[in-house]
Amino acid sequence: MSSLYQKLSRRIGYFFADLGLLELALTHRSFGGKNNERLEFLGDSILNYVIAEDLFHRFPKAKEGELSRLRASLVKGDTLAELAREFELGDYLKLGAGELKSGGFRRDSILADTVEGIIGAMYLDAGMDVCRQHILAWYKERLDATSLKIVTKDAKTRLQEFLQARKHALPQYDVVNIVGEPHDQTFYVHCHIELCEEFIEGKGNSRRIAEQNAAAKALKKLEKKDV
């Protein structure tokens, strides 16, 4: 095993029998040829299952919606990107020249996908039991800190429920501008609601975050109006 992969293996706590699987898990589609997309697909399903199973046993009285929101908070891209940075995965990615130049090794989406790729590769290399063991080890602190008391619906969900309860049309979100270099972009989104004459703007470093920020502002405005 190369010293580079030994270092990474120590960080993730697992040494691959088939190094080719690890190398494939680290290969972005921009590199050309075989890449980690199929492993990512597999890893995503395994991660969702392992976290769902743990939460099911950890919170025996939780409702389905509460468990779903807890799981979503743990498997979302932001959390996976945090894990990737803890492992310093950016140092090991195989990226195409353009992606490398634009800072792809720092991009949350690429880092998150790589974590899922490694999970898929680990499953193929050692099976479900070993894979589960390592996922739960990676997530131990986050799982131990999880509580039903802090489960909250995101702003878009709360806004949708607010409008549905009052029999109003659902909001519409439009990306109106994207500013910055590919590796450091700011998205501007307009949220349109029939109860508001003007659009509500939100911004963030991803479309999802911009939409959530717009929804939060819209909800605050509607609650002030006491619609």
UniProtKB/Swiss-Prot annotation:
Which keywords belong to this entry?
Cytoplasm, Endonuclease, Hydrolase, Magnesium, Metal-binding, mRNA processing, Nuclease, RNA-binding, rRNA processing, rRNA-binding, tRNA processing
MF terms from GO for this chain are: double-stranded RNA binding; metal ion binding; ribonuclease III activity; rRNA binding
Q: Which reaction does it catalyse?
A: Endonucleolytic cleavage to 5'-phosphomonoester
Enzyme class, UniProt record, top EC level:
hydrolase
Q: CDD domains, from UniProt? A: DSRM_RNAse_III_family (cd10845), RIBOc (cd00593)
Q: Where is the RNase III domain?
A: 5-127
Q: What is its EC number?
A: 3.1.26.3
The UniProt record lists the DRBM domain at 154-224
This protein is called: Ribonuclease 3
* Upper classification of the organism: Bacteria, Pseudomonadati, Pseudomonadota, Gammaproteobacteria, Oceanospirillales
